[in-house]
Amino acid sequence: MSFVCGISGELTEDPVVSQVSGHIFDRRLIVKFIAENGTDPISHGELSEDQLVSLKSGGTGSAPRNVSGTSIPSLLKMLQDEWDTVMLNSFSLRQQLQIARQELSHSLYQHDAACRVISRLSKELTAAREALSTLKPHTSAKVDDDVSIDESEDQQGLSEAILAKLEEKSKSLTAERKQRGKNLPEGLAKTEELAELKQTASHTGIHSTGTPGITALDIKGNLSLTGGIDKTVVLYDYEKEQVMQTFKGHNKKINAVVLHPDNITAISASADSHIRVWSATDSSSKAIIDVHQAPVTDISLNASGDYILSASDDSYWAFSDIRSGKSLCKVSVEPGSQIAVHSIEFHPDGLIFGTGAADAVVKIWDLKNQTVAAAFPGHTAAVRSIAFSENGYYLATGSEDGEVKLWDLRKLKNLKTFANEEKQPINSLSFDMTGTFLGIGGQKVQVLHVKSWSEVVSLSDHSGPVTGVRFGENARSLVTCSLDKSLRVFSF
């Protein structure tokens, strides 16, 4: 029977077995290995010559002859010894190579893990710095049982000059509104005409096609201002089908946009908790209003064109100067509670405004005193959108469960309720400039005749939730946007 040596891989002349590892070796090679290392070459346990057991096979044989150092057999013996040395060295090198490979693999894994940790820590550090930059020291002063005003160092309060400016603008707007209310515009769309509304244009390349869709809309004339999940704000001429300007700077989705009457200034509110004021002439950010500590959900421009209201998930509303970028006051809708404010809108006269919140309550606020003037608790789900009629008498509110309510601000009561069968959130509400029609954006687009509170037309052209609805001049067209990435124009 022949045995193979565990060191050389050749047939053994004098096979022995190691009591430590159980492997078979040629006695000549293993004795030399023990003399040099004192261990078993396979298990690396301590090994002596006494622990080697000879293996014998059946049959007879003669012992090898002794050779002298001057004969050819002697030379062959020397060559054999050299071969043995090479085999031992080769075996040792193979073991060292295997160990080196294992150590290298371990080091590479450690390096990869270290790189991942460094990358994660860098991201966390960047996020922490951004969060720190948004924090502002503030103290809260209790004003009354209904409201808490945040008196931060950056908030100047409503000065006498600001209040005088707002009151003067309110008086002029009230006089103009009374004059307009005597006669409706000759070109105002009729109910039967609006019933024939059809899609005349669909624009799908305004925002990123890879990140649907459009979340906010405002229009002035033939210009639309839209905000999207792609974090950008776009000024678009939908008649010429031309992008006029793209504004980039927010790092989260856009929740609300306002196009200033000057058609040059654009304002956007984002889930990154910032409000940005943009210049359409060079796409630059003229001011960043950093007053909230949570996503800004809605904004509304004062009729003076200089101030803006903002609502946030941090349970506060704020009044800010868009020229300086400074917050003038910041008020909690419910002191001691974290109630997200989903919607906010100025009354046409600019001295009162409404908020809709997650507690399903609509509140009317007096801006001068920052106090609640009235509360409407009729909804059963969070109020997602609100809109004042241009005549100043009515307020429309839409909730998460698909209900639209019309409130009389003179009698402080609910006049009408319109319930959608789909029970889907009402994302947008908008009156036309005369207050005759109300546009609703939910799972589809709907137009109601306010006086009769009846549906004039229902449009299901969008394939996703409708996030913005605006009437064109004299209600002769309707512009809408949706999470399906499209801006659509309807006319008759």
UniProtKB/Swiss-Prot annotation:
Outcome of gene disruption: Enhances sterility conferred by rnp-4 disruption. Combined with emb-4 knockdown, leads to accumulation and leakage of unspliced ama-1 and tra-2 to the cytoplasm, severe growth retardation and arrest in larval stages, and loss of interaction of rnp-4 with pre-mRNA and spliceosomal U snRNAs.
WD-type repeats, residues: 207-246, 249-288, 291-330, 336-375, 378-417, 461-491
Top-rank taxon: Eukaryota
Functional pathway: Protein modification; protein ubiquitination
SMART domains: Ubox (SM00504), WD40 (SM00320)
EC id: 2.3.2.27
Subcellular location: Nucleus; Nucleus, Nucleoplasm
Keywords annotated in UniProt: Developmental protein, Differentiation, DNA damage, DNA repair, mRNA processing, mRNA splicing, Nucleus, Repeat, Spliceosome, Transferase, Ubl conjugation pathway, WD repeat
GO molecular function ontology, one term from the record: ubiquitin protein ligase activity
Any single biological process term in GO: protein K63-linked ubiquitination
Gene Ontology CC terms: cytoplasm; nucleoplasm; nucleus; Prp19 complex; U2-type catalytic step 1 spliceosome
Reactions that this protein is recorded to catalyse: S-ubiquitinyl-[E2 ubiquitin-conjugating enzyme]-L-cysteine + [acceptor protein]-L-lysine = [E2 ubiquitin-conjugating enzyme]-L-cysteine + N(6)-ubiquitinyl-[acceptor protein]-L-lysine
Similarity comment: Belongs to the WD repeat PRP19 family.
Assembly notes: Homotetramer. Component of the NTC complex (or PRP19-associated complex) which is associated with the spliceosome.
PANTHER family cross-referenced by the UniProt entry: PRE-MRNA-PROCESSING FACTOR 19 (PTHR43995:SF1)
Known function: Probable ubiquitin-protein ligase which is mainly involved pre-mRNA splicing and DNA repair. Core component of the NTC/Nineteen complex which is part of the spliceosome and participates in its assembly, its remodeling and is required for its activity. Together with emb-4, necessary for interaction of rnp-4, a probable exon junction complex component, with mRNAs and spliceosomal snRNAs. Plays a role in nuclear retention of unspliced mRNAs.
Name of the protein in its database record: Pre-mRNA-processing factor 19
Biological source species: Caenorhabditis elegans
Encoding gene, per UniProt annotation: prp-19
